[in-house]
A protein has these predicted regions:
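N-terminal secretory signal peptides
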Residues: 1-15
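Predominantly a Rossmann-like dinucleotide-binding segment in NAD(P)-dependent oxidoreductases
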Residues: 65, 176-182, 187-285, 293-295, ...
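Active-site beta-strand termini and strand-to-loop segments that position acidic
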Residues: 295-299, 325
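N-terminal Rossmann-like dinucleotide-binding module
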Residues: 27, 31-103
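C-terminal helical cap and adjacent loop that interface with cofactors, partners, or active-site loops
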Residues: 23-31, 35, 72, 252, ...
Length: 424
């Protein structure tokens, strides 16, 4: 099924996404030299150039989901040099055939329908890139691991608690079976974000006070009238307007900054409360348009998060967050200036083109992990934690209640989709 990603790394028009996250924040007010400059050891250092990995063999890659992002990922895998696209699968037969032509895939290995991915897994692939509609990710990823096939998985990895838990179990099983399972988040791979995370976790901010984050989708997702089946909603970006298919905006888009915050701070919420509303006229899908969530961490630290999916010319920096300590503040974002200001561990860096460079790093890491036998699969557990955090916020805001993580897990609520009338 086509996957037109909700990340700022959306495949077909990356620059349009970037317009909403580009640029560094301008400094305001006069600051003394002492407040601007850190000790030599605290100044930002240029990231060392990555050592080129040796391409020891070509891996046969299967592409599940042939939308814009899927095609883009397959192209970057080919550009890397360690992969050849061996098979493709998409719900829509015409899409599978067309993309198969573009990628030079034998016609016998172009599969369609809901179960097309199963035939792909039997076609001789060694690895899969799953870029489909998120509702199907847990089932597809688990099937790949069961088949001994390495998994490169897009976000969001799941839309509900049972699916998220299944992803975690699949990651653990993959490690046991010497199978690589990598979740494609870009922000935590950036050298500046890694450095800020190291300093924050080392106490750079002092005792934590509060956290604030923003996740504004770059537009209101398309939401045409419903048909007799959901087939039409499995293409373009329409699935983003259906919570069961996408997880809602806080899960499908905001997860970038939520995951980034978990990576930087190493902290997880234990409860949340919030409010959400749908304000677009004549909604067809059930996604929310705006929501505000207050997360509570175990030690009482609060984290406020605001999200929206409206085309309204907003001027805030989407996918950004500030982490406020008692002696210093850190600011992180998907693109632009990032820093720690105050205290004794000042740092200023810049996140540049993480949309593409992060994916390239992940593809290289995926290949290296497979060929060098590294199967710790460390990205999976953080993805599970991030998704549970996003789902907790979604549910608390939708229900307008105080909800604990323990209650969310115990409830184990499953989202369902009516697949009646779809091609098997």
């Amino acid at each position: 099924m086509p996957y037109d990603a909700t990340s700022p790394s959306a495949s077909t028009r990356p620059l349009s996404r970037r317009q909403f996250v580009a640029g560094a924040a301008a400094a305001t007010g006069a600051l003394t030299t002492a407040s601007l400059l850190a000790a030599e050891s605290d100044r930002p250092q240029a990231a060392p150039p990555a050592e080129p990995r040796k391409i020891t063999r070509k891996l046969k890659l299967g592409l599940i989901g042939c939308g814009g992002r899927g095609q883009w990922i397959a192209g970057l895998c080919t550009e890397h040099g360690g992969f050849t696209t061996h098979a493709v699968a998409d719900y829509f037969e015409d899409v599978a055939l067309s993309v198969g032509d573009k990628l030079g895939v034998d016609k016998a290995r172009r599969f369609s329908g809901l179960s097309g991915y199963k035939r792909l897994l039997e076609s001789g692939v060694e690895a899969v890139a799953i870029e489909d509609v998120p509702y199907f990710y847990p089932e597809q990823a688990k099937a790949a691991v069961d088949a001994g096939v390495h998994v490169y998985l897009a976000k969001p990895v799941a839309v509900d608690v049972p699916g998220t838990v299944l992803i975690g179990e699949a990651g653990k099983l993959a490690t046991q079976k010497n199978v690589c399972f990598l979740v494609d988040y870009q922000l935590p791979t950036d050298p500046a974000i890694i450095e800020i995370g190291n300093r924050v976790r080392a106490g750079a901010l002092g005792p934590m006070a509060h956290i604030s984050s923003i996740g504004f989708g770059w537009q209101g997702w398309p939401d045409p009238p419903l048909d007799k089946t959901i087939a039409s909603r499995l293409q373009g970006q329409i699935w983003l307007s259906d919570t069961a298919l996408s997880g809602d905006t806080i899960v499908s888009y905001d997860i970038h900054i939520i995951d980034g915050l978990l990576a930087v701070t190493g902290r997880h919420p234990v409860a949340a409360c919030g409010r959400a509303r749908t304000c677009r006229p004549n909604p067809n899908g059930d996604r929310t348009d705006v929501a505000a969530v207050i997360y509570e961490q175990e030690d009482g630290v609060i984290w406020t998060h605001v999200t929206q999916a409206i085309t309204n010319n907003f001027d805030v920096t989407t996918l950004s967050a500030s982490i406020f300590g008692m002696k210093a503040t850190a600011h992180v974002r998907y693109d632009g200036k990032v820093y720690i200001r105050g205290g004794d561990k000042h740092y200023v860096g810049n996140v540049t083109n993480v949309f593409q460079e992060g994916v390239k790093r992940n593809i290289a890491n995926f290949y290296g992990s497979i060929t060098e036998g590294r199967f710790d699969n460390s990205t999976v557990q953080r993805a599970v934690d991030g998704h549970l955090t996003a789902i907790l916020g979604r549910e608390a805001a939708a229900r307008r209640c105080y909800l604990t993580m323990e209650e969310l897990l115990r409830e184990n609520k499953r989202l369902t989709v009516d697949l009646t009338g779809l091609q098997a």
